[in-house]
Structure formats: structure tokens, C-alpha cells
Amino acid sequence: MIVLFVDFDYFYAQVEEVLNPSLKGKPVVVCVFSGRFEDSGAVATANYEARKFGVKAGIPIVEAKKILPNAVYLPMRKEVYQQVSSRIMNLLREYSEKIEIASIDEAYLDISDKVRDYREAYNLGLEIKNKILEKEKITVTVGISKNKVFAKIAADMAKPNGIKVIDDEEVKRLIRELDIADVPGIGNITAEKLKKLGINKLVDTLSIEFDKLKGMIGEAKAKYLISLARDEYNEPIRTRVRKSIGRIVTMKRNSRNLEEIKPYLFRAIEESYYKLDKRIPKAIHVVAVTEDLDIVSRGRTFPHGISKETAYSESVKLLQKILEEDERKIRRIGVRFSKFIEAIGLDKFFDT
């Protein structure tokens, strides 16, 4: 398999630059304003002129303005960015029917039946980059490798506005040398846990008993890392986008008090159910944004549809789990529903 990964460079801020060329060359910061007080909220993304000063996604707006008071600060306009993203994704579909849209600014293409080798893949990547730049004035970074994970790693190495191939020999080298924190899907907290076990490189996961690894980071992540370290990872491109509906709300103050958080959580559920229309979810995730803007979530999938009453009770259990497992205060709380079935009016399809 040959996978081509496309990552839109500093996407939200770049769209703002395209729409307003006078912003080019200036530090631009796109923000999610929470409305708690003036400048409350967090940075969604920043262009490279801002990043070189330390302004990056996730930091509080107040902190960003201390670092870079003269930058251009703009509110996030998700609908505008989504329109541009949709057009670019349609361009990508011209190059492969097998496309997995990972997010608003990332996509994987299986180009195995389009090219014969990595040299042709590289040329196709250049063609895609030039086409997107010509049509949308947006620069992207392209990573190419034998699977999705190493294609993403290749793009991370080539940012911004670059292109890189990680061939099979370089994959073997990276398995030996790649820092565990640089593996996609392994966040800082998980990386810290692994390093306490002596796992500093990807290959180190092979030197520890699987049950011990599973006990530390969970079965799914343990299997994921082992398959990568053995050079056996081959998850296919999934052409269907996982659809979910949810809502996250900002609380008046950071808290770890269950009773204080519950009304905000229930509000998120109520607003999410309003958007479900006739779809019934089988999966629920409670999503918490912590005081340091990290994201923690816990979820459950049911064999049948979830009624609103079940969503209320299950969400409290999931919230309790988050509070038990994480000592940080919660800043924002929300819920995400997925794995939908169509409503047919029969009670037996609910898990109550």
C-alpha cells in the first residue's frame, strides 16, 4: 500500500490570509473566544509568523497576547473554513476514490493503484500541491509512506509547504529511532507514562510484556504501538467519514465538583439531541477540556440506541470516571454522539 497524506498548513489562519491578503507576513492568530470575559478562550491556530514567537494552538488568548500583543487576533469562522475544506477535499477525490477525511484540514489517500513506486508517488504529491495552490491559493504539506501513520510522520517532518517520502528502509530506521512522543496518536500524558516504563523509542515497546503495556495505556494503544514497532501496521483507508454530533459548553469557572458540572453537561446533551433529528446514537462520549486546555474523553457504545434519559445517566457515570482518573479542574464540558441508526418508533431499539 502507498498512502499519501495531505495536511493543510496552518489552515484557519491561512484561509484568513487568502481572504485578506493584507494579513500576509503579519502574525495572525485565530481564536475560540469563550465569552467568559474579554479575551477569555484559547488559540485555535496561528500562522508561522506567530508560532516562531511561541504562540500556538491550545494556549489561552490572554497568554498569547502577552507574548505577542501586536499580532492580528481573529475569531474562528468555522463555516468559512469548512467551505474551503470541502472544495479541497473534492479536488483530492479526483486523484483517488479511496480517501479518508481525518479532519477539516487532513486527508489520507490510498494511491496504490495510481502509482507504481515512491518516485511516481512523489510526483503525484507535487501535482496535488500545485493543483490546490492554483485553485484555492492554499499551501499544503504532503507525506507519503507505506501506511497512514508513517505518511503522517512524513508530513510532520516536511511542514510547512513541504513534501516527503518515507520509504520502506526509512520506516525500519524510524522504528528504531523515533521518539515515542512523536508517534501520531500518542499524546504527552501517554508518552510520559511510557517513558516511566523505559519506553523512549518506538522499538522499545517490543521489550516489555504486552500485559504490562496494556495495563499502563490500554489494549487498543498497546496493540497499535506493537503493530507499528513490528512493521505490521496496515490499517486501510476508510472512505466513510465518521459522523458525530455534539456540543461543548464553557463553564463559569473551572471546577471538579460533579454537581456543579452536571447542569452544563445536561445542557450539552439537550442541545445535541435537538440536532440529532431522527437519528438515534448508539455511542456516547463525554468530553472535558481541562484547566490547561488538554482534552480528556470517556465513552461507551451500546448494542442499541440510546434514549435521552440513558444519555443523562450514562454521561454522569462517564464524567465521574474522568474526575476519578484525572486530577485537573474542568474548564469546558460536553458530549459527543455517534454510530447512528434511524428512528423507527419502536421501544425495543432503545437501551434504557
Curated annotation (Swiss-Prot):
SUPFAM superfamilies: DNA/RNA polymerases (SSF56672), Lesion bypass DNA polymerase (Y-family), little finger domain (SSF100879). Binds 2 magnesium ions per subunit. Its EC number is 2.7.7.7. CDD domains: PolY_Pol_IV_kappa. Keywords: Cytoplasm, DNA damage, DNA repair, DNA replication, DNA-binding, DNA-directed DNA polymerase, Magnesium, Metal-binding, Mutator protein, Nucleotidyltransferase, Transferase. One of its GO terms (biological process) is DNA-templated DNA replication. Mg(2+) binds at residues 7, 105. Residues 3-187 form the UmuC domain. It comes from the Archaea. It is found in: Cytoplasm. The active site is at 106. One of its GO terms (molecular function) is DNA-directed DNA polymerase activity. Pfam families: IMS, IMS_C, IMS_HHH. GO terms for cellular component: cytoplasm. InterPro entries: DNA/RNA_pol_sf (IPR043502), DNA_pol_Y-fam_lit_finger_sf (IPR036775), DNA_pol_Y-fam_little_finger (IPR017961), DNA_polymerase-Y (IPR050116), DNApol_IV (IPR022880), PolY_HhH_motif (IPR024728), Rev_trsase/Diguanyl_cyclase (IPR043128), UmuC (IPR001126). Highly active from 35 to 95 degrees Celsius. Thermostable. The record marks 12 as: Substrate discrimination. The keyword Transferase applies. The catalytic core consists of fingers, palm and thumb subdomains, but the fingers and thumb subdomains are much smaller than in high-fidelity polymerases; residues from five sequence motifs of the Y-family cluster around an active site cleft that can accommodate DNA and nucleotide substrates with relaxed geometric constraints, with consequently higher rates of misincorporation and low processivity. HAMAP family: DNApol_IV (MF_01113). Belongs to the DNA polymerase type-Y family. Monomer. Interacts with the PCNA heterotrimer via PCNA1. This is DNA polymerase IV. The gene is dbh.
